[in-house]
Amino acid sequence: KKELPGAVAVLKRSFLSDAANQAELLLAATAESSDCALSVVEQPPLDGTKIALWAYLQTDVQTRVLPNGLYEVKHGVYRQLWMGGSFNRAANSEYQMRLLLNDYAMQLMEEGCTLADNCLRTWIFVQNVDCNYAGVVKARNEMFVTQNLTENTHYIASTGIGGGHADPKALVMLDAFAVAGLKPGQIKYLYARTHLNPTYEYGVSFERGTAG
């Protein structure tokens, strides 16, 4: 508090070395008192510690939990909408990813937003990524087409990486960030066509970065 006066957390992501044995205790200690989006993923910290915390803080904002589970962060004319740690237990990674994106799109609609116009960033954590990533890609590609997210419009900046959940049946986890109040054309998408080809050319659908 002394180093960052007035700052509040809007997202906390914990990286665990052994989610099956650590996640329940961690969530019990933090969930009830948390006023921000929480994400817990099994990715052993590189420095050898058992648990590491990544926190994103902001100042001069008002925060609250919305009825649909999203976390709202208001500043000026903008409303940031954060989601952390979403998962389900559908039969495989494709079905899980499809359900996660469909549910998230519905949450955004309740706030007058859409995936195409307002979602700026997703983080997708995939258990046993070598085996399950193909299902994630298929579900995302097919769902994005229904949301006017195509090679002719734009995609969403995203990280898709290996990461585990305390529940072995949870093959995919989703964190996401959207902003309500954006004007058409306000967001730009980062390209480096002289060095990197568009992602759709190798069968995936994400942007490498955004700028406002």
Where are these regions (language model features)?
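N-terminal presequence-like segments and the immediate start of the first folded domain
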Residues: K1-G212
